């Protein structure tokens, strides 16, 4: 008899009861969900004797924020089939995120079979926040994604969001992200991408090479680095410039940068970035720039006190995606995105639960 194939469809990995029916545009994203451990009362990690446990991760935060705004939102990931993995899924489901395609793995599928973890030391006043990641050999980094039918996974969706964090985790994740981008393009999904560079996961050059490779498949670009676009690519971290881009640009500077992107990647339909002004560890201001429909727009400036800064960029992304899905006018799009980020800074936890 012929040997039985090890390839399985997404639905065979997980109980289909974990989905629910909604209407409207359908959104899907893919990434790692992590256990977050935070010392209470702004304590430093070296002082901590106990931790508050919650869950988060860039793509999961976006899925949850959109679900809370009423969008049909699905999250695809790999977690261990144990109490921690199931608790992460339960947290997503409790916030109306579809988890049907999520994969729960056994030790024979991912040898370490663990959930990624990170420790957050919340800043206060002049002391900034600090993060320590413990996500090496997590379940998603060791899973064989050739078992996943991406055509089936993306069937029926309108929008796919991906980031530069997931491909930084491991080679298998890089392959998955590129394959998802290509499949999404074939199926006609709108694709958003956030480079989201993490220096603890890979080098600047590795990130730049990979993220630049992704650009031809992207419709909506969030953030403007790290990409191969500039003549002096070695001078990316001096003064108030990064990757040849000013950290706090004028309107004219930002318009010129956007035009540079569009000249090289005319398939881009929208580019947006937010700009942060840090007055202290507990007070910031935000505004944003967006290129859309041939014009550059500048948002209002929002100033706010910070309860929890983690997930502010994800809230910006989810706000923009929501506004685009609902056909907001351009200025309303960018103002809603910045307002979403600002309000997230007043909410404890990773996600913008409003």
Can you say where each PLM-predicted feature lies in the sequence?
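Positively charged, low-complexity intrinsically disordered leader regions
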Residues: 7-45
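Short pre-catalytic strand/loop immediately N-terminal to key active-site residues, enriched for Gly-Thr
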Residues: 46-56, 297-311
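Histidine-anchored nucleotide/phosphate-binding helix
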Residues: 58-68, 177-183
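Alpha-helix C-terminal capping segments
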Residues: 62-72, 94, 323-326
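Conserved N-terminal subdomain of the carbohydrate kinase-like
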Residues: 72, 76-164, 191
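A short helix->loop->beta-strand "cap" motif at the edges of active sites that frequently abuts
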Residues: 185-190, 265-269
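Conserved phosphate/ATP/ADP-binding segment of small-molecule kinases
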Residues: 201-293
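Conserved post-catalytic alpha-helical subdomain immediately downstream of the catalytic base
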Residues: 300-354
């Amino acid at each position: 008899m012929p040997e039985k194939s090890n390839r399985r469809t997404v639905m065979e990995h997980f109980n289909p009861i974990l989905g629910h029916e909604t209407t409207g545009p359908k959104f899907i994203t893919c990434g790692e969900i992590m256990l977050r451990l935070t010392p209470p009362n702004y304590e430093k990690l070296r002082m901590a004797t106990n931790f508050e446990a919650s869950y988060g991760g860039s793509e999961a935060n976006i899925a949850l924020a959109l679900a809370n705004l009423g969008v049909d939102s699905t999250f695809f990931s790999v977690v261990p089939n144990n109490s921690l993995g199931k608790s992460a899924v339960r947290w997503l489901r409790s916030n109306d995120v579809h988890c049907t395609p999520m994969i729960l793995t056994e030790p024979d599928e991912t040898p370490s079979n663990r959930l990624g973890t990170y420790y957050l030391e919340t800043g206060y006043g002049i002391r900034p926040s600090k993060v320590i990641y413990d996500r090496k050999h997590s379940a998603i980094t060791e899973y064989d994604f050739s078992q996943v039918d991406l055509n089936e996974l993306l069937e029926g969706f309108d929008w796919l969001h991906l980031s530069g964090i997931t491909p930084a985790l491991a080679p298998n994740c890089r392959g998955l992200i590129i394959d998802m981008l290509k499949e999404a393009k074939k199926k006609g999904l709108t694709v958003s991408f956030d480079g989201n560079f993490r220096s603890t996961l890979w080098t600047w050059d590795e990130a730049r090479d990979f993220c630049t490779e992704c650009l031809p498949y992207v419709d909506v670009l969030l953030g403007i680095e790290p990409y191969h676009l500039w003549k002096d690519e070695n001078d990316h971290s001096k003064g108030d410039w990064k990757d040849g881009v000013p950290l706090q640009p004028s309107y004219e500077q930002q318009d010129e940068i956007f035009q540079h992107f569009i000249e090289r990647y005319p398939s881009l339909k929208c580019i947006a970035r937010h700009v942060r002004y840090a007055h202290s560890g507990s007070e910031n201001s935000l505004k944003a720039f967006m290129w859309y429909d041939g014009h550059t727009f500048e948002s209002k400036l929002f100033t706010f006190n910070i309860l929890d800064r983690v997930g502010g960029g994800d809230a910006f992304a989810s706000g923009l995606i929501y506004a685009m899905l609902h056909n907001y006018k351009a200025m309303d799009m960018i103002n809603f995105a910045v307002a979403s980020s600002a309000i997230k800074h007043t909410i404890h936890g990773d996600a913008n639960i409003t």
